[in-house]
């Protein structure tokens, strides 16, 4: 009996928009851009498979290549058999950055007011205050050192003729791999 793959709950993870710089030898591929009825695999198809296997993106159906779930952009595309050594994509992926913790706000009676208007007891609110203190004493998240090593993770899952060369943790606001590209 095959093992059933458990799905990750995307709500438990933060995400971030990053840029990835790729290099690939196109000899074995039907170009960069995914084609639903193509005879050969494409670079985007291999990227999709690696990103979903690593649980870096959370599509509704992993078997259907649909980039809508992750703010995907690409700087260009290549034809069948063409190689590239500086292709850039922009994509929203899972991050190691901790989700913001809920801070406890007390009313004048010392009880936390919940969204539905219910109240917790004072003891629970005091526990919340302790939790709030812990939140402020945590060390700040380092965008590179504390983050998922995206190139290493993806390169382990991608075929040998497709490599992630680098990643940018903080692309400029409004970055689009397509429209921010200066040359092709």
Give a label for each model feature.
Residues 1-184:
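Structured-RNA-binding interfaces characteristic of tRNA pseudouridine synthases
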């Amino acid at each position: 009996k095959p093992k059933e793959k458990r799905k990750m709950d995307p709500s438990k993870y933060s995400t971030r928009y990053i840029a990835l710089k790729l290099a690939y030898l196109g000899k074995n591929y039907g170009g960069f851009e995914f084609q639903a009825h193509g005879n050969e695999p494409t670079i985007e198809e291999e990227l999709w498979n690696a990103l979903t296997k690593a649980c870096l993106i959370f599509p509704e159906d992993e078997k259907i290549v649909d980039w809508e779930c992750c703010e995907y952009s690409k700087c260009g595309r290549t034809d069948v058999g063409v190689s590239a050594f500086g292709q850039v994509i922009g994509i929203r992926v899972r991050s190691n950055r901790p989700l913001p913790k809920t801070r406890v706000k007390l009313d004048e009676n010392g009880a936390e007011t919940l969204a539905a208007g219910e109240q917790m007891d004072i003891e629970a609110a005091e526990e919340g205050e302790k939790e709030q203190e812990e939140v402020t004493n945590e060390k700040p998240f380092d965008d590179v050192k504390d983050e998922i090593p995206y190139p290493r993770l993806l390169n382990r899952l991608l075929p040998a003729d497709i490599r992630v060369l680098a990643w940018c943790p903080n692309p400029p606001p409004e970055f689009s791999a397509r429209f921010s590209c200066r040359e092709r």
